């Protein structure tokens, strides 16, 4: 029973790669600004999982500190990006990034 409960580095890294891949897929293929922001958040969460995984198996606190920094950075990025998306929606009545190619106003 003990061998089934142990989670190794490979499990964490696999989850991280899946999250990163989903985030990159969302950023590269979608045109909706909100979905793109969600993809960026998935990429940042994948980086957090990597930092915490290597921190756990290395024994240092550097990964935790980097992870906290990324969380703060993600919160600031989300606030600024959502403000920009709201202004784009008010101006152009859409959040489609392909239709917003010029910012004349």
UniProtKB/Swiss-Prot annotation:
Protein name (Swiss-Prot/TrEMBL):
NADH-quinone oxidoreductase subunit K
Oligomer status and interactors: NDH-1 is composed of 14 different subunits. Subunits NuoA, H, J, K, L, M, N constitute the membrane sector of the complex.
- Which membrane topology describes this protein? Multi-pass membrane protein
Matching HAMAP family, A to Z? NDH1_NuoK
Query: Short name of one Pfam family for this protein?
Result: Oxidored_q2
One GO biological process this protein is involved in is: ATP synthesis coupled electron transport
Q: Where in the cell is it found?
A: Cell inner membrane
Q: Which InterPro entries match?
A: NADH_UbQ_OxRdtase_chain4L/K, NUOK/Mnh_C1-like
Work out whether the entry's keyword set contains Cell membrane. yes
Stated family: Belongs to the complex I subunit 4L family.
Q: Where are the transmembrane segments?
A: 7-27, 34-54, 66-86
UniProt GO MF annotations: NADH:ubiquinone reductase (non-electrogenic) activity; quinone binding
